[in-house]
Amino acid sequence: MKKIILLILDGFGIREGENGNAIKMANLPNLAKIMSDYPVCELEASGEVVGLPKGQSGNSEACHMTIGCGRTVEQPLTLINNKIKDKSFFENDVLLDLIDFVNDNNSTLHMIGLISSGNVHSSMEHFYAALALAKIKKVKSVVFHFITDGRDSLPKSGNKLISDFMAKANKLGLGTIGTICGRYYAMDRDNNYDRVKKAYDAIVYNVGNNFTDYNRCMELHYKNDITDEFINPSIITKGSNIKENDGVLFLNYRPERIRELISAFTDESFNMFNVKKFKNVRFASLYSVDNNIDGAYTNEIISGTFGRYLADLGFKQARIAESEKYPHVTYFFDGTEELSDKNLFKILVPSPRVARYDMKPEMNASGVTEAVLDAMDDDFDFILVNYANPDMVAHTGNIPACVRALEACDVCIGHIFEKAQENFYELVITSDHGNIEYMKDADGSVITTHTCNKVPFIICNKEYKLKKNGTIKDIIPTIVDVYEISKPKEMTGDSLIIK
């Protein structure tokens, strides 16, 4: 039976232009030779293909899910947008129960979420719809706890985003800003609970920098060259902290970066730092992101995923990634299932403990590579590996660091390619979405967001011929074709191999 390695270069898109293109600046001899020697095609990795609105850039979660499911899966952004459009959002039982609780207690509704134009973790339209519902239901007090972005939106766009949103809130005559905090603190996903504590303390105890208004807060941070991602936990309205009998709505719809903060509120066994034990506070989330609180909308059960299919066939699988992308090669690739099987081995390689990955752009690519080489020695049938560097370092906006990140990955690819040839593995190289290929605009502005560019697909076997174009939902049907096994009936993607 054939053995296959699927290698995902996270955030590696295709773009011909050289301005702000770290890929064009980097010396990538191994990848260049592979792309010249073996079949290559280009894949769509954004918008409707990955279950997002048309023109929306792909993200690692949606794209890994699309890859692993071999089909388009409606993403939370699209689902909730549609619910708002058809007005059923305003009749959602979870949201109405939370609002009834607030009204019955004559208390405050707190809304916590990322304020961003990126639509990756949250949507401003969802914020506004939730506020509109509160207005309709005559909630008397709403407090916003804004998490500023700077990664999936421009680094200093937060002030305008807040201003635009508050203009709408003021028209409704409802809502004040309680706290502002950068996602560096509130949306950690690598167990940096010292950061999370600062966000929590601002929201619960009103501990943080004090400002008289949000504009002063943002402008002072910008003046000190602190971008949205790193805004220090700041108090805008004194006395705006969560109190007994209040209600709390979390508005992020992606779980992995809000889970640590939520757990500080809802996990009875939480012990990472001292937390307040509320007796009568009601929590809910717009989307199901934590098992301890109700979500207004939940994940659909997805059948026919590649991981489950291989498990049922008895294939020995390895999933390998750094901490930053570990959920993507496991939970998201498996269609939001925590798949468990005696032949499935999940290998987490710790990401380096640094404030920003441009401080160590190599990240732990060497550790990931070592795990892949060991997996080949152990004769796994399918190895899925993700290199986080291109995406994570590109989010810092540091182009020289991105060049180093890419060159580190290229060395790793060389080692994997060589051993794959020796051990009779078919090596398939691709990406989930673009990012590192477009980091500077024509006017010189730094870009840290994902792109809608296509991504490469390379199969390191000259016997195959590939179609010129496809989508990332075609990746697994192609691998199924290489294995010479039947495709799960649920998959709508097609093989990229020309017969």
Write out the residue ranges for each language-model feature:
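Feature captures the catalytic ectodomains and active-site-proximal regions of enzymes
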Residues: 1-499
